[in-house]
Amino acid sequence: MPPAADLRLVVGYDGSPPSARALDAAVSLLRGRAGGIEVTYVAHLPSMAALSAGAIGEMETDFDDIERELRGMAGEQLAGREERWVLQRRQGPIVEELLAAAKDAATAHADATVVIVVGSSSQVTHRVLGSVAVGLARHSPVPLIIVP
């Protein structure tokens, strides 16, 4: 990829080893370029039809705790390496929300090149049923990097 004048990297991040590798790759991609990293945590609720209002509220509190933990993990991983990052939390289906985050980044930075960066999954269920990376590969209107 030729150096972009402004590179905006949307990194899918959940604290897992694949997402940590994706974040490391984003740091390498951004080195020497203008831009920033949008570390994106997607809080995904299962089908809410079977959940009570109390259960949904409790899950929201859990998501707040997870967001704080992930912000700390990302901060530690990026400390001394990259300071141009923000963590955003989105809620909904993971693929749809990462695509929406990329669209929002493109809208906010009209002259930037937006790239989604995610880690690959080695879980058998993901290989059989599909993973976030596969869903993004099928639907992403922006460049996508899947880090092994």
Q: How would you describe each model-predicted region?
A:
Residues 22-23, 49-52, 97-100, 127-129:
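Short, well-ordered secondary-structure micro-motifs
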Residues 38-40, 86-90, 145:
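General small-molecule cofactor/ligand-binding pocket signal
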Residues 2-53, 139:
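Small/aliphatic-rich secondary-structure junction motif
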Residues 33, 81, 132, 139-141:
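Short, structured coil segments at secondary-structure junctions
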Residues 56-69:
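A short acidic, glycine-rich active-site loop
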Residues 41, 119-121, 148:
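Short secondary-structure boundary segments
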Residues 1-4, 76-116, 123:
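Structural beta-alpha unit
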Residues 115-139:
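Glycine-rich, Arg-bearing micro-motifs that act as flexible, cationic patches
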